Amino acid sequence: MSIDFRNLNTLWGSILVETLARLGLKIGVVSPGSRSTPLTIALARHPQIEAIPILDERSAAFFALGLAKQLYQPVVLVCTSGTATANFYPAVIEAKESHVPLLILTADRPPELRHAHAGQTIDQVKLYGNYPNWQAEISCPSANIERLRYLRQTIIHAWWRCLDPVPGVVHLNLPFRDPLAPTPDLEINNLEANFDQEAFFSHISRQNIAINHSILQINSLPSKGIIIAGLASPQNPESYCQAIADLARSQQYPILAEALSPLRNYAGLNPHLITTYDLLLRNPALRTQLTPDVVLQIGELPTSKELRTWLEEIDCPRWIIDPHPDNYDPLQGKTGHLRVNIEQLGDLFPDKTDNNREYRQLWQKFDQQARLTIDRLLAAETKLIEGKIPWLLSQYLPPRTPIFISNSMPVRYAEFFNPPSDRQIRPYFNRGANGIDGNLSTAIGIAYKNVPSLLLTGDLALLHDTNGFLIKKYFVGSLTIILINNKGGGIFQMLPIAKFDPPFEEFFATPQNIDFCQLCRTYGIDYHLISDWTDFEQKIAVLPESGIRLLEISCDRAFNTQWFLSNYV
């Protein structure tokens, strides 16, 4: 793209955006506003960058988060000055906690208009606290080549800080003086005449710097161990699953795989898979019988409270394998961290194919028995209950479907009931901060220009983010929303507070009594109320090629809780 020399602000904006384009930026998400005009114009006119306007900043930020999860590279997020910037905050927190690269560009008033009650002006410097990987304020635009070089190099640094050493958020605050519109300014003509665009950008590379990992050398592991594969959304799920399968085979260890890990969807790669660990560990005798001598934990711990409590009880040595510098041990156990990708583990652990196979086979025997019980129970259930939904999704969804699983009960039912399969379903999630805000917008971002995708969510999580439906105007792709409508917060029904009503129903369950058919009509969303399981199976077996569709499953919250407590716990 040619640099825009119409005035100082268009020059500044186009240098910034051209630098990002050469670094590999594909998409910019823009919320409307006046102060951000130079950034908006530069993004909108660049032929290699897709600029998407999203009205609501909070929704825009989660949409960008979803895009970045799908693309595995930074997405730019732009807004005007003032409180608009604060609406990015929830997504900033989630991006930081889940290591998603976002480059946030907040426009601002120039310094002389701050602290003087100028309109739409707040203190935006370091607005997001300690959540960004890096943050800085760019100087006001200036028409000299040294300042343009400064801008270019700062943007290059910001891009790589989004990715290295850990993916996350970078915040740049950019003040602009008037005129914000691209009105001509003849004073910068001399700079244009002496500007060599190709020479100016020639050194920019899309190749990241190499990262060196300090790896602890381990001579041997105990023969009686387990691998715990926590939530993960790797760019190449097959190689990720293969690396864990190779480790399991070399050590003869069973793998306890979370539903938010791709392992359950690549079961053919791994005959050592255990998926019913939550149910098995509710049995006091098995908790003792299945105690290992060592645990290899891949990434974060699974959601299961039973598993976490058991690990606290046994307190055996645990190696946490993950490249990020975070502490992934909320249990404060006997842990050591190996800061390396599982795919790079190689021969760190010597082959122990003669290890204690009886221990691994014991896990597999109990897992097969528990799986048979769960499958029979769910297959026989004709009433619409929440737990059967993820169980059927894992069997009927088209292969390789991306599925965003909302927080609260959907992630837990997936962990409890999802069977292993070879359908290569790709799970996505916002488990960095585990909130229910922004789930719809994130799912739309994941589905954008992707294969037909799916969102599994509860009613309260969906209602938290109905502004996400405004993205429909610009949405390209297919998203099917599975709405579990239990008229309130189902997770609270499982807690002791449920026995105290009042105030339980009004202040904890908080039913909203929304007509979702009417809500969908408002936004032009295709709606269908599921009548029975056959209807549901037919609707999810073939996903639409385009558009947004909502399938509502109405569940009785009290009955569902009673079913779970009677049949599972």
UniProtKB/Swiss-Prot annotation:
It is an enzyme of class 2 (transferase). The keyword Transferase applies. Keywords: Magnesium, Manganese, Metal-binding, Thiamine pyrophosphate, Transferase. It comes from the Bacteria. Pfam families: TPP_enzyme_M_2, TPP_enzyme_N. Pathway: Quinol/quinone metabolism; 1,4-dihydroxy-2-naphthoate biosynthesis; 1,4-dihydroxy-2-naphthoate from chorismate: step 2/7; Cofactor biosynthesis; phylloquinone biosynthesis. The keyword Manganese applies. Catalyzes the thiamine diphosphate-dependent decarboxylation of 2-oxoglutarate and the subsequent addition of the resulting succinic semialdehyde-thiamine pyrophosphate anion to isochorismate to yield 2-succinyl-5-enolpyruvyl-6-hydroxy-3-cyclohexene-1-carboxylate (SEPHCHC). Homodimer. NCBIfam families: menD (TIGR00173). Belongs to the TPP enzyme family. MenD subfamily. This is 2-succinyl-5-enolpyruvyl-6-hydroxy-3-cyclohexene-1-carboxylate synthase. It comes from Microcystis aeruginosa (strain NIES-843 / IAM M-2473). The gene is menD.
